[in-house]
Amino acid sequence: SCIILFIFYSCISHLYGQVQAVSTVDTGYELWLNYKSGSNSRLKQAAIRYASQVRLAGSQYDEVIREELERAFKALLEITPGFVRGEEAGIQMSFCTDKRLGKEGYIIRSGKKRITLPASYDAGFLYGPFPLIRLIQCGEPLVQLNIREIPALEFRQLNHWDDLNGNIERGYAGKSLWKWEELPEKVDSRYTDYARTNASIGINGVMLNNVNADPRILRRDFLKKVAALADVFRILHIRV
């Protein structure tokens, strides 16, 4: 009986170890937003000096920016940034009058004590933090940054060829992301993940359905479903 118990507990232990291993596997779901702490302690400490305190600009995207910076800095730098209003912040966002930046452009500059991120309009503050996070994520030094980004195209959209029945014309990677049968009552959290990923690379529009459109999409009940998705995307500067 002792031998049987030993074999039993050995199997359970092995199975538990396998489950733990599976639970920590990188599935790729987060794509490039899978924030993991780097190994270069010197660059990490330098980044922490900037990232410990952040001053937001007071834009309509402040809450989204706050959540993204908290998520990134906790994972990459193992700190929880403080959000302040004063000049002591190591990362400072503020509105500027440089109209050449357009409605979605931004600047990132760094000095010895702070990184400044000016933009002329709200969307610039949504887009600006992502490349800054990416530099930290890739272990790049944050000294003497002088980045100026202005989108070359006004409309940068993803064109889905999704049918209302969940199929995708010429689709080879599963069913449609949109769960029309659940909307608008249930809004899947994946829609927010999708929008966040798009915003991180400057996508500002999405076409939900196939170009060979099912006319039901224009019915009142389906427009309510579309509106539920639009409410999620709007928070991240994405239009349907």
Regions found by a protein language model. Give the residues of each.
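Enriched - but not universal
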Residues: 14, 35-38, 164, 181-183
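Acidic, contiguous N-terminal accessory segments
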Residues: 17-123, 138-148
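Bacterial Sec-dependent N-terminal signal peptides
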Residues: 1-21
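Feature activates predominantly on carbohydrate-active enzymes
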Residues: 59-68, 72, 99-240
